[in-house]
């Protein structure tokens, strides 16, 4: 937890940005796994953490902008809880730790909101991603649980996005720590990548590192020989010689700040010539982004530029043809890279995605696209100093997508389908690093680059 002055300052800024009314920020509850007493690993809501800092479940933070009052609502534990879980500070003590003057039992929250509504104060809350919180909100505010998104405050969303999108010095230190944990995870994955070891075994090793150094992984690890599956979870299948292992994994540090990196490792210890060709194509796009990303440059242009670099290299491999600009404008490259270049990162690995990507990554001028591939771009706006972005181009050979496009004759003027068939069982390559946008350019969030050059990846894989 940061010093209470940081949370106080954040709430004061939020008041100024919202202007009037009552802001209600819901913390998360425990979520049962297979029966009520066996819960999933607890994860606090990120916006609640940002403004109220407390990790305990069952809390709601309230900021009355008009009357300049702040409350923490929640229930104190009883002796039965103490027997099983030990002593937990009272809600009043938790409030004081983050500079909040008032606390009250959860049962009083509804009456508090009723009084605010009777006084015609606007009520500001965020869209919710958990059904139990949606039900809680419906009980308090009086609308159907499925209507919470429609009633969410755009004013509050935009205010929080503006604050959380630009990372402050204390946050950058936490992100650096998360990145350094991620370095250890990916090097361990490379060292353990060999024929006969299961995907699940390696995932267990790297997730153990994340748990031992922080709060665990920042998302379920993607670790698979089938890198063409964008979110392929680890299986119990043993790694096979000749294939590539794609590992997309990250960590949360003790303050819940995230990291997210992707590397690809040859199971045999050496890349084949075919694998090198695709790997270098992706790396060229990745490196171009690192060279060009700076304040004022649109992330949309970074994405399209990376796609042009990838297309040029695929033309050299005879997988694509024709004019590069025309091919990218038509979306032909999306058969190979059907996703966006990257995303914001912070307290969420896809930072603030639950608030709506139209607010986080777009504006009135730059809107989300409907074109296949480009429609998965999570950000298009100009970069600003303090943004933390992932740089993660990729190239994939997805058999079902190849068959669909080939059968439709789609983009046949740009794609050499006969040559693509030679890569049908290739899998996929994605290379991802976390970048901090600085005053004049960008730098890695962490202290050191995870091995990425082909010779370095092979060295770690073969020799440890």
Tell where the protein language model's regions lie, with residue ranges.
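Active-site neighborhoods and metal-handling regions in enzymes and metal-associated proteins
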Residues: 1-464
């Amino acid at each position: 937890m940061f010093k209470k002055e940081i949370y106080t300052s954040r709430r004061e800024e939020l008041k100024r940005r919202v202007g009037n009314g009552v802001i209600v920020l819901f913390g998360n509850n425990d979520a049962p796994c297979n029966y009520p007493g066996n819960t999933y690993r607890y994860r606090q809501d990120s916006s609640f953490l940002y403004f109220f800092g407390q990790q305990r479940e069952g809390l709601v933070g309230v900021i009355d902008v008009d009357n300049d009052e702040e409350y923490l609502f929640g229930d104190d534990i009883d002796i039965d809880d103490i027997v099983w879980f030990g002593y937990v500070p009272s809600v009043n003590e938790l409030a004081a730790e983050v500079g909040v003057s008032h606390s009250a039992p959860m049962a009083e929250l509804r009456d508090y909101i009723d009084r605010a509504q009777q006084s015609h104060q606007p009520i500001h809350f965020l869209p919710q991603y958990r059904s139990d919180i949606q039900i809680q909100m419906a009980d308090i505010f009086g609308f159907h649980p499925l209507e919470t998104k429609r009633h969410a405050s755009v004013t509050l969303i935009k205010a929080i996005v503006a604050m959380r999108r630009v990372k402050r010095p204390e946050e950058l230190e936490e992100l650096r720590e998360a990145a350094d944990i991620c370095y250890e995870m990916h090097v361990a994955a490379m060292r353990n990548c060999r024929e006969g070891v299961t995907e699940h075994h390696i995932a267990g090793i790297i997730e153990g590192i994340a748990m031992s150094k922080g709060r665990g992984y920042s998302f379920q690890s993607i670790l698979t020989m089938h890198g063409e599956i964008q979110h392929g979870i680890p299986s119990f299948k043993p790694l096979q010689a000749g294939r590539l292992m794609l590992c997309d994994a990250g960590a949360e540090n003790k303050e819940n700040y995230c990291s997210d990196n992707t590397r690809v490792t040859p199971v045999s210890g050496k890349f084949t010539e075919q694998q090198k060709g695709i790997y270098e194509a992706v790396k060229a796009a990745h490196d171009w982004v690192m060279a060009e990303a700076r304040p004022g440059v649109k992330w949309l242009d970074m994405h399209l530029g990376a796609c042009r670099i990838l297309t040029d290299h695929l033309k050299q491999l005879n997988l694509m043809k024709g004019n590069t600009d025309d091919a990218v404008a038509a979306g032909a490259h999306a058969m190979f890279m059907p996703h966006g270049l990257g995303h914001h990162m912070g307290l969420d690995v896809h930072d603030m995605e639950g608030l709506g990507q139209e607010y986080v990554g777009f504006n009135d001028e730059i809107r989300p696209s409907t074109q296949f591939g480009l429609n998965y771009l999570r950000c298009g706006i100009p970069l600003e100093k303090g943004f933390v972005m992932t740089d993660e181009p990729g190239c994939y050979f997805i058999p079902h997508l190849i068959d669909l496009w080939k059968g439709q004759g789609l983009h046949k003027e740009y794609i050499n389908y006969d040559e693509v068939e030679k890569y049908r069982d290739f899998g996929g390559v994605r290379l991802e690093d976390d970048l901090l946008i600085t005053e004049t350019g960008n730098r890695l969030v962490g202290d050191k680059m995870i091995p990425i050059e082909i010779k370095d990846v092979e060295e770690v894989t073969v020799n440890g």
